[in-house]
A protein has these predicted regions:
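N-terminal alpha-helical modules
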Residues: 133, 197-199, 214-220
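Intrinsically disordered, low-complexity acidic/polar segments
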Residues: 171, 189, 212-214
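OB-fold/S1-family single-stranded nucleic acid-binding modules
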Residues: 177-183, 206-230
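Long, charge-rich alpha-helical interaction segments
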Residues: 18-137
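Beta-strand/loop nucleic-acid-binding surfaces
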Residues: 174-199
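Acidic surface patches and DE-rich sequence motifs
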Residues: 34, 42, 170-172, 182
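Structural detector for short beta-strands of small beta-barrel domains
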Residues: 126-174, 202-207
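Extended, charge-rich, solvent-exposed interface segments
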Residues: 2-35, 39-41, 156, 195, ...
Length: 230
């Protein structure tokens, strides 16, 4: 493969576009099925979408299966800049040598250009950034929320204001794991679509159960049959 280089900002913007298009970081081709379970197509990896956008000739398989070129929108540009600032300031700083991943990310984000064989590192950064922000939000919230269940198990909720603090694509299911705050209580549920961090209205839901957070130990009310609006 060619060692041609591209600007770091350009490649990072494409990584954000690929994340937006795929809805998650896809490291290996993922099958997509219809509602009745019939195979439809393979979803391309974020990395190959980025590569083929910049170098279409890289795709040597059937042309009809080639990924569509990514189109960068203003939100991708803004996210790319936010990611560069975040990783430089908070996650890795100027520390070298902790592990290969951190060392490579430090090197890439400190450089003005990225080689094609480094695209894999850049492709995962939007996902890592989203995960780290979510983990920080949940950790902070776990120290501030009230203990106890939001309501009795089995009871119904309607028209409640919520703050979404985490929305992470599930590795095992077709959906997003949501963490939120309602009435200063932490709640969670599985949602069919991604939700933006911030204000949200729980149009309706039911209380499924209440357990301790697997990592922080605070009470978390699990919801189901959730209809949320933003």
């Amino acid at each position: 493969m060619s060692k041609k280089e591209f600007t770091t900002q350009q490649v990072l913007e494409l990584a954000c576009a690929a994340q937006r298009v795929n809805g998650a970081y896809i490291k290996e081709e993922a099958p997509v099925y219809s509602e009745d379970g019939a195979f439809m197509y393979l979803k391309h990896t974020n990395k190959i979408q980025m590569l083929c956008t910049l170098e279409p000739a890289i795709w040597t398989a059937d042309p009809k299966d080639a990924p569509m070129p990514l189109k960068v929108i203003p939100e991708d540009v803004a996210q790319a800049e936010e990611i560069r600032k975040y990783f430089r300031k908070f996650l890795f700083g100027a520390i070298e040598g902790e592990n290969d991943f951190q060392t490579n990310i430090n090197s890439i984000l400190s450089s003005e250009t990225v080689k094609q064989n480094q695209f894999g590192y850049v492709a995962c950064l939007p996902s890592v950034h989203t995960r780290d922000i979510a983990q920080t939000n949940v950790k902070r919230a776990s120290r501030a929320v009230e203990e106890g269940a939001l309501a009795e198990i089995g009871s119904s909720l309607k028209d409640l204001d919520a703050e979404i603090i985490s929305s992470i694509k599930s590795k095992n299911f077709e959906g997003w794991n949501i963490d939120a705050i309602i009435n200063n209580k932490m709640v969670s549920w599985m949602n069919k679509t991604n939700l933006n961090l911030g204000a949200c209205v729980i149009v309706k839901a039911k209380i499924k159960d209440c357990n301790k957070h697997w990592k922080h130990g605070n009470d978390v009310t699990r919801l189901h049959y959730v209809k949320a609006a933003q």
